[in-house]
């Protein structure tokens, strides 16, 4: 971190925890009798409580979206480029709420939490989740914060799925919906990538059918491979080629040299996998990717996406990125077509970017411009 906080930073922030004792019935039929949600806020809630913005995170995201926890932190929250004074999600204007979803591993109730019914860690017994469950818990968080209606709900990737679900599950509580690099349902290829990642986890001898904590071990190798698989899909071929090409980290192609060749991209992927394996939970990963797979916005509407959006009241911004092949621009155009068919107000932008799916997280002048101008139109 620099010697002083950047002028456009939200500054030092402290996570907060809310405990909920009213049971939450999940889509799977199981109820969580009590649970915690960890969240952060940036900016000030106005007297009318009309300026609140909810940030919905993606697979590996969490509540720390902006600012710093300590002056010693090496990097800010995961979306700091877009949240702060004068930034697209302007904290001089908006009161921003970011949370860690249920089933995660960054403080909200999840597989690593204690099951109050047994006194033991939930582990493999933690129930499977759906996107609608996250949205229901987020609505309860809004109630606890005194927020009847969100000025905007914003999310990328899996976060965008939550935004869409909000727009049809609680239509009267969302004024603007920003859906970034997302889809109304996963493709077969996406489901296949998720299953390959899960297979890597459950094949790790240290997984113990999900009860690894009871065995005082962690399936780090399996989780690392799962992250490597996922990370490949977040990058574009162009970006990988430009950054790494066929450059070597060690070894040589010269004849007569026995030392094994290691490419830079191999080293990079191993680093990403190993880092993730010590910061994330395998049971959380399995549940979150399953929620991704299960999501299908139109399923309960006779598979008609136009009908699914019929009751939505929000105005929409849909954003895609040209080299994103995990959630390709065509998937975003399908969202737009459904919204147009349902006669909803929608703005669409396809951003030229070389960074693939990860582009929604990274600084980009055009993306920032579109984002900023759209949110400037939101009246509070």
UniProtKB/Swiss-Prot annotation:
Keywords attached to this entry:
Acyltransferase, Amino-acid biosynthesis, Cytoplasm, Methionine biosynthesis, Transferase
InterPro entries named in the record: AB_hydrolase_1 (IPR000073), AB_hydrolase_fold (IPR029058), HAT_MetX-like (IPR008220)
Please state every residue range assigned to the domain named AB hydrolase-1. 51-362
Localization terms from the record: Cytoplasm
Q: Which residues form the active site?
A: 157, 324, 357
Q: Which GO terms describe its biological process?
A: homoserine metabolic process; methionine biosynthetic process
Q: Which GO terms describe its molecular function?
A: homoserine O-acetyltransferase activity; homoserine O-succinyltransferase activity
What's a Pfam family in this record? Abhydrolase_1
Quote the record's binding site residues for substrate: 227, 358
Primary localisation category? cytoplasm
The reaction(s) catalysed by this protein are: L-homoserine + succinyl-CoA = O-succinyl-L-homoserine + CoA
Span-the-membrane segments of this chain are none
What EC number is given for this enzyme? 2.3.1.46
Recorded metabolic or biological pathway in which this protein acts: Amino-acid biosynthesis; L-methionine biosynthesis via de novo pathway; O-succinyl-L-homoserine from L-homoserine: step 1/1
Residues the record annotates as the site (Important for acyl-CoA specificity) are 326
The Gene Ontology CC terms held by the record are: cytoplasm
Q: Which HAMAP family match?
A: MetX_acyltransf
Instruction: Summarize subunit and interaction data from the UniProt record for this chain.
Output: Homodimer.
- State the family named in the UniProt similarity comment for this chain: Belongs to the AB hydrolase superfamily. MetX family.
What is this protein for, i.e. what is its function? Transfers a succinyl group from succinyl-CoA to L-homoserine, forming succinyl-L-homoserine.
PANTHER family in UniProt: HOMOSERINE O-ACETYLTRANSFERASE
- Listed name of the protein: Homoserine O-succinyltransferase
- From which source organism is this entry? Cellvibrio japonicus (strain Ueda107)
């Amino acid at each position: 971190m620099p010697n002083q906080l950047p002028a456009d930073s939200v500054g030092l922030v402290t996570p907060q925890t809310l405990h909920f004792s009213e049971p939450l019935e999940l889509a799977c039929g199981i109820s969580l009798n009590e649970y915690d949600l960890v969240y952060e806020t940036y900016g000030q809630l106005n007297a009318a409580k009309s300026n609140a913005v909810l940030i919905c995170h993606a697979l590996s995201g969490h509540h720390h979206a902006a600012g710093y926890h300590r002056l010693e932190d090496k990097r800010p929250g995961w979306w700091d480029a877009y949240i702060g004074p004068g930034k697209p999600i302007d904290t001089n204007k908006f009161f921003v709420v970011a949370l860690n979803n249920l089933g995660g591993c960054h403080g909200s109730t999840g597989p690593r939490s204690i099951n109050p019914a047994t006194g033991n860690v939930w582990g493999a017994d933690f129930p499977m989740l759906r996107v609608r469950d996250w949205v229901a818990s987020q609505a309860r968080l809004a109630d606890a914060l005194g927020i009847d209606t969100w000025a905007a709900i914003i999310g990328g990737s899996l976060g965008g799925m939550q935004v869409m679900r909000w727009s049809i599950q609680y239509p009267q509580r969302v004024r603007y919906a920003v859906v970034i690099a997302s889809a109304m349902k996963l493709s077969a290829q996406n489901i296949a990538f998720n299953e390959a990642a899960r297979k890597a986890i459950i094949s790790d001898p240290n997984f113990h059918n999900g009860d690894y904590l009871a065995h005082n071990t962690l399936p780090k190798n399996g989780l690392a491979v799962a992250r490597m698989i996922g990370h490949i899909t977040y990058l574009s071929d162009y970006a990988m080629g430009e950054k790494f090409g066929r450059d070597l980290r060690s070894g040589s192609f010269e004849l007569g040299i026995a030392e094994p060749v290691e490419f830079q991209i191999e080293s990079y992927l191993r680093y990403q996998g190993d880092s993730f394996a010590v910061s994330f939970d395998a049971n959380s990963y399995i549940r979150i990717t399953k929620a991704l797979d299960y999501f299908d916005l139109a399923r309960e509407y006779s598979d008609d996406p136009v009908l699914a959006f019929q009751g939505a009241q929000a105005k929409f911004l849909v954003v895609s990125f040209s080299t994103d092949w995990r959630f390709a621009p065509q998937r975003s155009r399908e969202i737009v077509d459904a919204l147009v068919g349902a006669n909803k107000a929608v703005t669409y932008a396809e951003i030229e970017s070389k960074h693939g799916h990860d582009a929604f997280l990274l600084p980009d002048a055009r993306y920032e411009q579109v984002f900023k101008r759209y949110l400037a139109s939101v009246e509070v």
